[in-house]
Amino acid sequence: MAGLQARYTCETLDDIPKQWERFISQVGKVSSRIGEADYGLCIDMSAGGNGFDYVTGVQVSDLANLPAEWVGVRIPAQTYAVFSHSGHVSTLRHIARAIAEEWLPQSGREPAQPSRGEPNLIERYGRQFDPNTGTGDIELWLPIKA
């Protein structure tokens, strides 16, 4: 996976759409792209409220010849709980909170503890996602302990 990375806090979350705009303007330059989905990766989320890194990215076959600002991110093979979302993209943070506060305790599952630099949560935007309406094919992938 490769893409643009920036750090966010609760106060700066509203800047994420600007990162997506930059990403969309550059993704056509990535010749090693695999598939049609776009991804939002939430990385190094801390319970202490220090924010998290967010990567707007795509799957790639290799990390060569990427735009200068882009970084590579390793996505480990592991078990994921996958949640489909049919609402507007702006409600994803509410869905993520419901997963953490309701689904996890009720399911008896535990979130995996990713290594530094690996995602705590993955947003997957499929072919049917329409960035103009903010709706369509959206999934949230939560790494969980097997």
Question: Where in the sequence are the language-model features?
Answer:
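A solvent-exposed interaction/effector surface
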Residues: 1-146
